[in-house]
């Protein structure tokens, strides 16, 4: 077993001893918030972990990588990668009783960059994540009408036909790309601000501010709704979905295993990435949430419970989504068949009702035998239920195009639309609680505003600042900017941060010290499983996933999909290359948080090297005194 521990002088002076923890907890009662009860804490963590990615990415990956076969690598990596890191974040936050910045600064001053990296990543992800919530609110507002505005194409200016762009695509495509985003044909074509999206963005940030205005004191109340309502809606959708024609086609298609996919490296790497991102690890929010717990809270049990529910939710959502996708595919299959039947009836003047799906092939053969020349003139569509089911869509396309199209074909479609977007709103909002916590608490530790200022002011300034920056997402090119940030802000930086977190706890803080801390908090030491995963397995898996992502991103040209009515294959999306200046944006978005970790460590090393010996001795004495008094500023 690896027992390497790097030199870390002054650690005992920077962190409270185990004997002091209970006293510190009592002293914090009046100055630091605590959870009202265990349910608040668990619901908040679940809300942060279970987000929009569970709805629109996991089902896509399941379907793309062998259906039920994908569950095998997903569950294996859930156990070997997700749960150990979640347990580590819960335990270190509960032990050191600080936010992410304070935790890593306490472990070693040079690790302050790790907390800064988490804060920057939380900020950038929250920047675009709340824009998605604003889109959800726009669809929710438009759901309170009959018929739904994306049910039919609008008429053109002359009232003589449908708008050409809609007629060439579909009503759901047109409502999403034109009436919602009013999208341009390039990220370079910024266009103007769409006022309706700006108003929705303002509403989204206002709601978030009201829910996070006093930290866990307000979010702890909100999660009773935001973290439980999605499960109620999902269950309602499952019951409704299973009663729809063709729902079982989707579920069978989803879980039909293709075991050959298990031999593909991409399957395992995508499973590892999905486990990692679905837990919202490395944002700093989970560390902050756990720091408000009692010293003797059983963080091991919490991590296992949250992990099991998170994994169960991913599978549960996939079943719900593909029951609806199965219904949609069956509807499209029936429409396709109806078109072919009509073609045959009109071509041979057959009586209506004489041709059905069951006898269609037989009627084709009869017509072909009776008049081969006339039959050869007919053009039939290819109707394949598996082809319709295979049209895998992830991300916003699943929520705002595929699901909305399926909803329009349901009876009482406005009701189902309202329920669906309320569910998405709750999932997105509860995830944003963790992102805000990952920004607010580190900024408090940095003392960017005077300590006497109330938390409401800091939270308000953050919401206002991010709202103003978010104007870029309300431009005609806003969706392209959001996709860019989604691809790079919440991927490579999080992998680097998570790897550094585990390395720092195991080899800088010391895994033996960590084991003793946990034994003090929960009554027993972590077993051999946790030892092996923390020391070797989990860091190795994260390193492999990071290297894979890095190699793929560096070796491939950066491209993105655009919506261009002038494209010859419209309504298919067109893939084009990013302009060169986007590479600078990618470096800023992915590189700055990642480089903050070694950058601050180098800065600290140079500063300590240049410091006079007498000053260094005085600094250590000051730090020790401040730590004992609880006044240490990070």
Swiss-Prot record:
It is found in: Cell membrane; Apical cell membrane. The chain crosses the membrane at residues 42-62, 68-88, 121-141, 193-213, 222-242, 269-289, 305-325, 414-434, 457-477, 491-511, 532-552, 582-602. GO terms for biological process: amino acid transport; neutral amino acid transport; response to nutrient; sodium ion transmembrane transport; viral life cycle. The keyword Cell membrane applies. Changing residue 93 to R: In HND; no amino acid transport activity when expressed alone or coexpressed with CLTRN or ACE2; increases surface cell expression when expressed alone or coexpressed with CLTRN or ACE2. The keyword Mitochondrion does not apply. Changing residue 284 to R: In HND; abolishes amino acid transport activity. Changing residue 405 to K: In HND; abolishes amino acid transport activity. Its main location: membrane. Changing residue 69 to T: In HND; increases cell membrane localization in presence of ACE2 or CLTRN; does not affect interaction with ACE2; amino acid transport activity is not activated in presence of ACE2 or CLTRN. Changing residue 501 to K: In HND; no amino acid transport activity when expressed alone or coexpressed with CLTRN or ACE2; loss of surface expression when expressed alone or coexpressed with CLTRN or ACE2. Robust expression in kidney and small intestine, with minimal expression in pancreas. Also expressed in stomach, liver, duodenum, ileocecum, colon and prostate. Not detected in testis, whole brain, cerebellum, fetal liver, spleen, skeletal muscle, uterus, heart or lung. This is Sodium-dependent neutral amino acid transporter B(0)AT1. It comes from Homo sapiens.
